[in-house]
């Protein structure tokens, strides 16, 4: 009888080892779109969500979880390269949690925990891999929703993806793994416009090109995904009478006008028009060196129209990367705790202990995008921190605008044991926020000083002005200079051009009165706008632009106020307190 009981226990333990817990969800999205809409050629991010939240179950420190990966998805594995499925995953503080490996015959991905003799009591995180659709699946797939079934011993997860046709209204680049390298396809659709010349050139590559494998084809009878038929690319969609791909050489004739190829560069030109239903595909092969894990060929495509002018969007940089290893993040777990299997709590693995510590009743002025007639008050009270293993609080207020400051209060009570986060420092009422993070026993302090922004708009509106922002952080002083405000003044239109960080933003306002000075200060001071004594009242056709026919007293300023919106989030990161000035223009 004793033997029978032992046998039963062994069977029960084995069943628990391979159960899905603590995997709570499995998701699949396109890496290109970060959504469930994808091309057949896309990389797919497959995420395994681990969570013990709301459960009293624990996990054996050396437990194994097996997940059957659907045959439609596969790891891309090259000969003589590292297996992309083999990896070790850690907490954000560097504590190893588990390792993974994929059996290419059984199509089973195995997660093995790394703490023999321990019991895992707390686990939160996401392990993800990048996979491709199998060639066998793409040969028979149809556009529309497709469901992927991931099976465990006790549960099946079935995320779905909407497979769509290629966008044949613009140039695109696709890639495909081949033995020893990557095959790239640059597709130019005739429907893109009245094109007479196509110039394709590589800008950079980490590998080399096989010039003998540079080929082209022109096709019109595309499949339902808008693609060249994958079963036999050498038979269909070529302008060769034999139906074969034509290698690109100087002697290959029209439509190839010129061709140059070296180890690291390719340049070629095509002359002649494409019909609206035709697609030109140029194929070239990148060889992979043994130590290259990522190939990203940057290709320029320049198009010329029938009137010999370049298109408005002259150059298209097509830079889809191809990887021989999975793009995963080994720091996958935000929370992890394990205790000895005998039940005596003698050690604890701490992933992160962090808290946002602020001066009580700290006032934050936030003005952005949405306006409110009265101040918006947001109060957030964090719970008492009772878990010494992991706690993180992120408080963020955004998309709120007001003429007056937004009052924002954070109160974080702390326990007094050795695991309690650092207490708030500073004096109540100061305009200084101190952030203290306790992570692995280290302490970090950042001090931010209040910032005053001043923007000056000239009366004439033709000079450039400078705005200087000074920020004091950790004792260092940072100065950022922005080139400010140029006006182009017409009868009823003022165009404001702002250059910041090298980017140019243009906003056009109608019926805007001249502005002399606009000064915005944070810390609770109101926005002051000063207008000149007179305004151009009307403009008459036939007069020179910008010359008023009469003047009058300033119009009454009118403000349009919409309902305030508050977005208050809580995530696993250090708290963020943002201070942004708001500039109001009377229109």
Swiss-Prot record:
Membrane topology, as annotated: Lipid-anchor; GPI-anchor
Signal sequence residues: 1-19
Annotated propeptide span(s): 563-587
Positions glycosylated per UniProt: 239
S-S bridge residues: 211-261
InterPro entries for the chain: Zona_CL1, Zona_CL2
A Gene Ontology term for the protein's cellular component: plasma membrane
Region span, 4 X 24 AA approximate tandem repeats, Thr-rich: 432-531
Pfam families per record: Zona_CL1 (PF22320), Zona_CL2 (PF22321)
Keyword Membrane tagged: yes
The keyword Glycoprotein appears for this protein: yes
Superkingdom of this protein's organism: Eukaryota
Protein modification: The GPI-anchor is attached to the protein in the endoplasmic reticulum and serves to target the protein to the cell surface. There, the glucosamine-inositol phospholipid moiety is cleaved off and the GPI-modified mannoprotein is covalently attached via its lipidless GPI glycan remnant to the 1,6-beta-glucan of the outer cell wall layer.
Keywords, comma-separated and alphabetical: Cell membrane, Cell wall, Disulfide bond, Glycoprotein, GPI-anchor, Lipoprotein, Membrane, Repeat, Secreted, Signal
Lipidation (GPI-anchor amidated serine): 562
Physiological role: Putative adhesion protein. May be involved in cell-cell interaction, interacting with other proteins by salt bridges and hydrogen bonds.
The protein's name in its UniProt record: Putative adhesin
